[in-house]
């Protein structure tokens, strides 16, 4: 909900509206704490937001979700072959398959402060698909988990 002291105030900044939108979807959201999130955010949100990480399962793969300021591509959490590291922090959407280390790194981008000329958007996980969308619902990129690897869907 907070943009941090190093970032300009986002255009159309409306944290109370965001709170209402998020709370409406509280049963659909898995959340991890970002480096600007605090106990004040937890007081107004109706789902947990202060966990440093969460581990989700997709078949035999683990999806290690974290903000990215502690664990990231340069400092990996414990991963097994084929696991997915899902982190933000850079505010730049991406999906990279690291063949040598045998893991996949994904970044959902940023809803409020996208960087490096990326779009205001988000990523959703539906079944075996990871979909990056903008606020108009346009799909920018879709990746699908197949046989413990990730493939770009055409």
Annotate each predicted stretch with a short phrase.
Residues 3-11, 113-115, 151-153:
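Active-site-proximal loop/helix segment associated with metal-binding centers of metalloenzymes
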Residues 31, 64-65:
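Short catalytic-loop micro-motif centered on adjacent basic/acidic residues
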Residues 2-6, 39-42, 64, 72-75, ...:
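Short acidic/glycine-rich loop or secondary-structure boundary segments that cap or lie
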Residues 22, 56, 65-67, 109:
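Generic structural signal for conserved hydrophobic packing positions in ordered secondary structure
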Residues 1-58:
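Core catalytic region of metal-dependent phosphoesterases/phosphodiesterases
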Residues 62, 69-148:
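Conserved beta-sheet core of the metallophosphoesterase superfamily
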Residues 26, 145-154:
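Non-catalytic terminal accessory segments
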